[in-house]
């Protein structure tokens, strides 16, 4: 079966932080968007979120014809997906809810329309267990803010057709994203597994009084974080090996992996640890509001993305 990859109408189910990010990205790429969310006040909240991020999208560059007015909010799942060319679900992370929702989505959608789920913690074989035509169903796990960050992890389940994965990658690329095909179904996929390891270590360091939350964030943003925006861990360590590269690095520093530097198991989330983390991040926020911090983040990301894009082009890097 061939799947639709030329998208004119994008269906978004769930309009929270992630869902609204998908809506904003699709609108910015000149698509008609049909959205559904059963929560009271969801439409007003969605339109407000889209309006808040539109300035950043304008700065990044809108596709001709892009408009917030191309968003339509509907009352039922069936109306949302019936005429859609691509469907993205971003409902809460509860398996029972997603099973019921995808049963309804797949029954109402055309059989050659791809269905993506934004889930970060559930496996596609489980999410799509009750779906009709599960061969067209994938996980498309994005990163916040979805309307700016390009990474989307694409994961197939036991019934997903290889052609559906390639078709989904093509669709996500058309939305200006950088799809990463996760080859096996594993909990947390790729990026969140890496982030979870860092998060656990950070909590241990706070819990043991080694560092404050601000000091840990400084260790990241003034060190590895600057490199991570343009060069990942493996290339960074390749450079650390000098002219001999990664093999020399592994030979020289490989034994250090046996040193007990890291805790790995998650710390117990005691009231004290939670309080320490909350107090620390409150101090970091200072006088700034969450919305103000979001605007700061967006401006930084736009600047970093543009700088990396320009520098990559100059050096012929992918």
From Swiss-Prot:
The name this protein carries in UniProt is L-carnitine dehydrogenase
Q: What is the role of this chain?
A: Catalyzes the NAD(+)-dependent oxidation of L-carnitine to 3-dehydrocarnitine.
Q: Name one GO molecular function term.
A: NAD+ binding
Q: Where does NAD(+) bind?
A: 14-19
Involved pathway(s) = Amine and polyamine metabolism; carnitine metabolism
> Which GO annotations describe the biological process of this protein?
carnitine metabolic process; catabolic process; fatty acid metabolic process
Q: What is catalysed by this protein?
A: carnitine + NAD(+) = 3-dehydrocarnitine + NADH + H(+)
Record-stated family: Belongs to the 3-hydroxyacyl-CoA dehydrogenase family. L-carnitine dehydrogenase subfamily.
Q: Which cysteines are joined by disulfide bonds?
A: none
Where in or outside the cell it occurs: the entry states: Cytoplasm
HAMAP family associated with the record? L_carnitine_dehydrog
InterPro entries listed in its UniProt record: 3-OHacyl-CoA_DH_NAD-bd, 3HC_DH_C, 6-PGluconate_DH-like_C_sf, 6PGD_dom2, L-carnitine_dehydrogenase, NAD(P)-bd_dom_sf
């Amino acid at each position: 079966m061939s799947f639709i990859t030329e998208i004119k109408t994008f269906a978004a189910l769930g309009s929270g932080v992630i869902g609204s990010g998908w809506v904003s990205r699709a609108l910015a790429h000149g698509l008609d968007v049909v959205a559904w969310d059963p929560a009271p006040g969801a439409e007003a909240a969605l339109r407000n979120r889209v309006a808040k991020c539109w300035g950043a999208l304008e700065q990044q560059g809108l596709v001709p014809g892009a408009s917030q007015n191309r968003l339509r909010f509907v009352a039922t799942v069936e109306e949302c997906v019936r005429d859609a060319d691509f469907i993205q679900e971003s409902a809460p992370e509860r398996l029972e809810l997603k099973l019921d929702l995808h049963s309804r989505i797949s029954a109402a959608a055309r059989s050659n329309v791809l269905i993506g789920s934004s889930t970060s913690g559930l496996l596609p074989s489980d999410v799509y267990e009750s779906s009709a035509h599960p061969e067209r169903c994938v996980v498309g796990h994005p990163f916040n803010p979805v309307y700016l960050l390009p990474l989307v992890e694409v994961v197939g389940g036991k019934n997903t057709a290889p052609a559906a994965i390639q078709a989904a990658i093509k669709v996500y690329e058309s939305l200006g994203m950088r799809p990463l095909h996760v080859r096996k179904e594993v909990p947390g996929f790729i990026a969140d597994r890496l982030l979870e390891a860092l998060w656990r270590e950070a909590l241990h360091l706070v819990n043991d009084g080694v560092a404050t939350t601000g000091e840990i964030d400084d260790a990241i943003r003034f060190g590895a974080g600057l490199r991570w925006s343009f060069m990942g861990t493996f290339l960074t360590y390749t450079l650390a090996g000098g002219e001999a590269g990664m093999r020399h690095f592994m030979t020289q520093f490989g034994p250090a992996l046996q040193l007990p530097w890291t805790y790995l198991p998650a710390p117990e989330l005691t009231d004290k640890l939670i309080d320490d983390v909350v107090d620390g991040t409150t101090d970091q926020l200072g006088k700034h509001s969450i919305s103000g911090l979001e605007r700061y983040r967006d401006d930084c990301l736009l600047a970093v993305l543009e700088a990396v894009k320009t520098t990559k082009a100059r050096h012929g890097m992918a």
